[in-house]
Amino acid sequence: MAIASCFFCVPTPNTAISESNLTWPHIASFPRLSSSSSFNGVISAKSISFNRRVPITPVLSASSGNGGSDNNGGGLSGGGGGGDGGKNDGDGHGDEDRDRNRNEAMLLLKESGIELESLPKDLAAAIEAGRIPGSVITRFLELQKSAVMRWLMQFGGFRERLLADDLFMAKLAMECGVGIFTKTAAEYERRRENFFNELEVVFADVAMAIIADFMLVYLPAPTVSLRPPLALTAGGISKFFHNCPDNAFQVALSGTSYTLLQRLGAITRNGAKLFAVGTTSSLVGTAITNAFIKARKAVDQNSEGEVETVPIVSTSVAYGVYMAVSSNLRYQIVAGVIEQRLLEPMLHQHKLALSALCFAVRTGNTFLGSLLWVDYARLIGIQKSH
C-alpha cells in the first residue's frame, strides 16, 4: 500500500506554506531576480519571519500528474505542477507554487545576507525559475556551515542529493562500511588459510564490491533536480528521461510533479546504469580472480582442481542483470519509500534515531540481497550448490 501510494494519490489544494497558515501577499513577477532586487513597497523581509527553524525534511508534493501536496513532517509543502516533469497543471496552481517558492527563497537569502550571484549557477537558475522552495534554501544554509559538506556541495551530483537528504553521506558511509565488512567476511570464509596469501585478489574483490555499493546508494537516491532544460533540438527519448526523477518513489518538490510514466522511467534509467556498473565491476573482479587462480596453478601443480575458474562473461552479465532488477528495485524502495516517506516524517527531529533505523534497514537489505544473489546464481547455473 505504501508503494502504491507513491504512484497514485489524490491531489489536494495547497493553501498553506506551514502549520501556522501564513498568507503570502501576492508579489508581482520579477523580470530579473537578483540579490539587488528591491522588495521595498511590495514586501519586507520582516513582514514574514523565518526565524523559526524549519525542519529539514523532504517537502512536497507526491502527485503523479496533477497538482497536490503532501505535508511530510511539517516541512514546507506545495502542490505539484502538471504531469510533464515540472510543468504546471494548467489551472494556475503551478505558477502560484513557483511564485511562492521564488519569494520564499529570495527572502531567506536576503535575511542571510547571501547574494544570488554567489550561489552555484544551477541552484541560482532554479531559484529564479521558482523550482526551489524555502525549505531547500534552509537546508542549503545549514549544510554550508560544515566545511566538508561545503566542499561536497561544489559537485553537482552531491549537491542535488544533499539538498534532498542531509543524511545522504551518512547513508553512503553506512552502505560502504557494511559492504566492506560483509564482503571481507565472505572472502575469509571462502579462502580460510589462504586468505592472507591471496590479499591481492581479496582487495580487488572488495574494491569492486565497494564501487557497486557506492553506485547502489548514489543512483537511486532522491534528489532536488537542478538540471537545466535540454535544448529544443534534443530527441523525445532524451527529453523524457531528462524529466524523470532519480528515485521513482521520491516526494516531488512544491511546483513540480511526476507522471506515473516518468516514475517508471526512473526505474528503467537507473536499471540501465546499474546494469553497466554491475557488469563492469564483475568483469574486472572476476578477471583478476581467474588470473590469480591460473597463476597459482602454474606455480603449484598440487592446486590443480582445488579451485575452479569462474566464467567471466556469463557471471558478469548475470550480475549486471541482478543489479538492474533486484538491487535497483530494492534500493529505490529503501530510499524513496521506507526512508523518505515513512521514517523521515516521523523522526525528522530525531536524527540519531533516524540514522540508527536507516542503518538497520540498509543492513537488512544488504543481507537480503546476498541471499537473493546466491539463489539467483544457482538458479541460472553460474554457481553450484555443494
Curated annotation (Swiss-Prot):
Q: Which PANTHER family does this one have?
A: PROTEIN RETICULATA-RELATED 2, CHLOROPLASTIC-RELATED, PROTEIN RETICULATA-RELATED 4, CHLOROPLASTIC
Q: Which residue intervals are annotated with compositional bias (Gly residues) in the record?
A: 65-85
Q: Which cysteines are joined by disulfide bonds?
A: none
In which compartments does the protein localize? Plastid, Chloroplast membrane
Composition bias, Basic and acidic residues: 86-99
Entry keywords, A to Z: Chloroplast, Developmental protein, Membrane, Plastid, Transit peptide, Transmembrane, Transmembrane helix
Which GO cellular component terms are attached?
chloroplast; chloroplast envelope; chloroplast inner membrane; plastid
For this protein, the record's Pfam families field holds: RETICULATA-like
- Give the bilayer topology: Multi-pass membrane protein
Family the entry assigns: Belongs to the RETICULATA family.
The record places the transit peptide at: 1-61
**Phenotype upon loss of function:** Pale interveinal phenotype due to marked reduction in the density of mesophyll cells in interveinal regions of leaves.
**Organism's domain of life?**
Eukaryota
Designated name of the protein: Protein RETICULATA-RELATED 4, chloroplastic
Q: Where are the transmembrane segments?
A: 201-221, 273-293
Free-text function comment from the UniProt entry: May play a role in leaf development.
